[in-house]
Amino acid sequence: MQAIPMTLRGAEKLREELDFLKSVRRPEIIAAIAEAREHGDLKENAEYHAAREQQGFCEGRIKDIEAKLSNAQVIDVTKMPNNGRVIFGATVTVLNLDSDEEQTYRIVGDDEADFKQNLISVNSPIARGLIGKEEDDVVVIKTPGGEVEFEVIKVEYL
């Protein structure tokens, strides 16, 4: 497997979720399975089957997170010298030259992306267009809604 780029915050969130799943959720599910077994016949026991299904989802998520963390290339952008260039983990303020709107994005890994919080995946069209650009650069980015022209206003390594 290839390295998965991830910010320090993203890796911390995954570790927290993994800890929660292992220390809280897994024991809850095991207890639910044990309780459902006490009700007798497992073939027609809906509680048992539901708990087993939850166990499958939980164990699958644990394996998924462990795989991502073992292949993660954690990048702490705050430790890098800010040369004004857009890189993975950077917070970028751009001016949409078509709508004259200023927008701020943080370029993060796929698992961390949340457009509502302005966290965009490094593999998104906007991030791919901005990577490598510097302050005052103008770039035309092909988005699902058509071509959009942006000017890079500010690049921060927060």
Swiss-Prot record:
PROSITE patterns: GREAB_1, GREAB_2
NCBIfam families associated with the record: greA (TIGR01462), PRK00226.1-2 (NF001261), PRK00226.1-4 (NF001263), PRK00226.1-5 (NF001264)
Leader sequence residues: none
The organism's taxonomic lineage, starting at the top: Bacteria, Pseudomonadati, Pseudomonadota, Gammaproteobacteria, Enterobacterales
Source domain of life: Bacteria
A Pfam family matched in the record: GreA_GreB
GO molecular function per UniProt: bacterial-type RNA polymerase holo enzyme binding; DNA binding; RNA polymerase binding
A single Gene Ontology CC term: cytoplasm
This protein's UniProt keywords: DNA-binding, Transcription, Transcription regulation
Known role: Necessary for efficient RNA polymerase transcription elongation past template-encoded arresting sites. The arresting sites in DNA have the property of trapping a certain fraction of elongating RNA polymerases that pass through, resulting in locked ternary complexes. Cleavage of the nascent transcript by cleavage factors such as GreA or GreB allows the resumption of elongation from the new 3'terminus. GreA releases sequences of 2 to 3 nucleotides.
Organism: Escherichia coli (strain K12)
InterPro entries, per the entry: GreA/GreB_C_sf, TF_GreA/GreB_CS, Tscrpt_elong_fac_GreA, Tscrpt_elong_fac_GreA/B, Tscrpt_elong_fac_GreA/B_C, Tscrpt_elong_fac_GreA/B_fam, Tscrpt_elong_fac_GreA/B_N, Tscrpt_elong_fac_GreA/B_N_sf
UniProt record similarity statement: Belongs to the GreA/GreB family.
GO terms (BP aspect): DNA-templated transcription elongation; regulation of DNA-templated transcription elongation
The protein, known as: Transcription elongation factor GreA
